[in-house]
């Protein structure tokens, strides 16, 4: 694609810039890991998106951060593997496929399991193709030769092996437990699939009569229909109000069942009446209480949310219909004494919207405590631990690991990894294995599939060839270097990958975890369908381009923080790219057919040349350091300031002097510096804005095929000149001050005015005299005087800069009162700066701990502010003469 035409198109058009480039990168195989043993490997596995539809802004943000990391490392000489893949997303995908079938008047049961799975695979193929297209639009440098899917054979083999090994170790078991149950889809749900909503409900206050006829005990519930499964009433053992009742029984209203009054510390004495009904089959806390007291578990609902035969006369009713009828009956019986309105949080299925039912069910579980112990212990080993960025999320992770519950891993679905367990048709014997029993005709396989998170937990190593530990990719690229993900799935995914990685590979699955927040709208609200505030990243790309979206997403927040998405800010980024484009056009038009090998930085340089090269060095150092710390926002801001302010607004303007002059040697040096600085800047910017940087770089004199594999910039000490940088800062301060004064008195730059500069000493005088051509070019004086012993002219506008005072005698334009007010404001500013720096230097803690260079820097600031303050005071005194 090499294109060293000197002219870019006149206008920046993101559509034409981005068109075709991604395909060109893929054809060049620039994103494929090479396996080159001379290079250090660097690995990231993409958090696999669900094959359920379009990618959202959160995906765009998450993958952009990964792309920035991998593009940077590739340019730094690493053998980079960024492995793509997708998740089968059990319930989410099955719900989508079932929804599509319903539109055709078909249920999954009409099709049967095999035919339904064919439909699910068709869905997967269609939406996987959409996702790849979206990845391409964002510009993600993925190694598609290694793409994986959680239901691929290799990954399925890994899942079965892990299940069997955990089962053989006694870490997977089958038992009864309270799970989140979705009556609409008839499956267990993980906590992340439950959305909690504030709902207007009620406390139903009831009197349960003591069986001996001596009175009653009052309690309240928000789910009266579950009372049909009550097997006890509980009070706190130290509650003096009820101590005398412990061991007695009450008669369950309507049902007539005699149930005990028990004592348990689970009960809060000060909440409500201090009495709670215990329904072990319909509440997780009650289940635990029931286990402690050996209470029976009475399940009163069917899987579809209807009441079963244990509910007596309410058998067959929907649970909410039962609630209405039961409340009427309780009122008629005189048991229900009050209905108190109550707003409370109720779990709803993320997929079906149905109210989730805590439900007793026989499921498969992972025994978590032994696995979590190893993961917690790992964090005590400084060299082996997983590093969380920001660090505070390590505590979040550890808190959860230290208070972990067993994990329900079975789901009543068809789409997913079918549990590798079989039941003997005659004996009921359970067989668990990676292969089916030899006499398969005598066995029935478990109908359930595994929780999607079970296979996702193996993602960092199953994608690299495990359980074949001799796999070339597994040996070279595991463990991975970084995981980029949101804080909302630390528990559900990050923690599980860590303990499974430790259990089956003996290593952490990744060295670093970079945590980001959620994408919110400009008002800070979570994006959702109900609010109608969601934004499709493809729409953003169409309007402003992937580069603009990527730069905003990657620089718009700090690690761990939420991101407020703003189209206005994306537009501002587009304007920034447009400025880069125009600056690049200027550079290219002045290259005079220069070849890469003709770039020569050894010629005599102006102060502006030395300054821009020094600033480039500083920017390279800042960007590289911040990238290493995952501070993409800071890195991006360093680049933005350098490109917009230093390169475009100052250096390019100053470069016009030699470019349009007669000195051929100066022209050549300036062209070389323009080409070099733009080349290095495009490389630094490339991970953020891959498309436009490739386009510009291809037009620049360059070597190599693509910027994607060009070397990352490094600081060049031979181009560092801090003295020249200080000289340039003085020039910039003078030019800015003159422009500000002219603006205050409405004197356009085109109008020539007399200008006088009083240099602090001979050294400053020499600097300013040497660089006077810049002052004349950018300040447009009719006459320029630079001396060390100047007297301030009467009625002159004044500015104070480090090392000099400026005077613009604008007698006819000055309002003395306004000038006095302006100087008093300046004096106030310098008073505050002097106070601030002196306070810092008088702080013994600061002086004792700060590096000597920092303290010296503060003392230099103090001296500078004192001199500026004195100059302003003198000027105010002159005005009073």
From Swiss-Prot:
GO molecular function terms listed in the Swiss-Prot or TrEMBL record: aminoacyl-tRNA deacylase activity; ATP binding; valine-tRNA ligase activity
First-tier enzyme category under EC: ligase
Subcellular location: Cytoplasm
Keywords in alphabetical order: Aminoacyl-tRNA synthetase, ATP-binding, Coiled coil, Cytoplasm, Ligase, Nucleotide-binding, Protein biosynthesis
CDD domains on file: Anticodon_Ia_Val, ValRS_core
Coiled coil region boundaries: 810-881
Ligand binding (ATP): 529
InterPro entries xref list: aa-tRNA-synth_I_CS (IPR001412), aa-tRNA-synth_Ia (IPR002300), Anticodon_Ia_Val (IPR033705), M/V/L/I-tRNA-synth_anticd-bd (IPR013155), Rossmann-like_a/b/a_fold (IPR014729), tRNA-bd_arm (IPR010978), tRNAsynth_Ia_anticodon-bd (IPR009080), Val-tRNA_synth_C_sf (IPR037118)
Catalytic activity entry: tRNA(Val) + L-valine + ATP = L-valyl-tRNA(Val) + AMP + diphosphate
Sequence motif: 'HIGH' region, positions: 49-59
Motif placement: 'KMSKS' region: 526-530
Signal peptide from the UniProt entry: none
E.C. code: 6.1.1.9
HAMAP family xref list: Val_tRNA_synth_type1
UniProt domain comment: ValRS has two distinct active sites: one for aminoacylation and one for editing. The misactivated threonine is translocated from the active site to the editing site.
Biological role: Catalyzes the attachment of valine to tRNA(Val). As ValRS can inadvertently accommodate and process structurally similar amino acids such as threonine, to avoid such errors, it has a 'posttransfer' editing activity that hydrolyzes mischarged Thr-tRNA(Val) in a tRNA-dependent manner.
Family under the similarity heading: Belongs to the class-I aminoacyl-tRNA synthetase family. ValS type 1 subfamily.
Quaternary structure and partners: Monomer.
UniProt name for this protein: Valine--tRNA ligase
Gene behind this protein: valS
